[in-house]
């Protein structure tokens, strides 16, 4: 999957989108995905990249996976110290788990979401290794219970801009309409993306499961 200068957003008033969403966000579900860096089209780690997330109706994320330097206004030193690490975030943007990215390696994740008890748990492995839990069960209590706390499962490359010093102070925090975007072609590889309803165990690979 790649992003370049043709990856633009259209204002919401230009159309009224409709979509059919699967009813998967109930009970306990595990969101599985594997990601590999694209060395031909490297990311610019001065930027923040939101690469997997569940977006609720208010624009917040039940959980998210981030690469690059978190957007701040005013900006700090770039790239940030953890810019080259995958970071799994909760709804309040706390980092639950991080893993250094490495070229030519597949980074495998499963994020377990308990929709009733509002908790998260992260599983991770590299390449062909089976998934293992890398966190305990963590409260995610800032997310709204019920329907408002559910949303759309996204995987892709959402690149936030850098602050443009020529913008007005009020515009410098508007990441949708303002900021610096170089327009270079950048990419990631995705594989093994699926959602699993968890009753007795979480799939870890090779037909095996582990108790949640």
Label each region the model flagged.
Residues 1-81, 90, 139-212:
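Low-complexity, Ser/Thr/Pro/Gly-rich disordered linker/stalk regions
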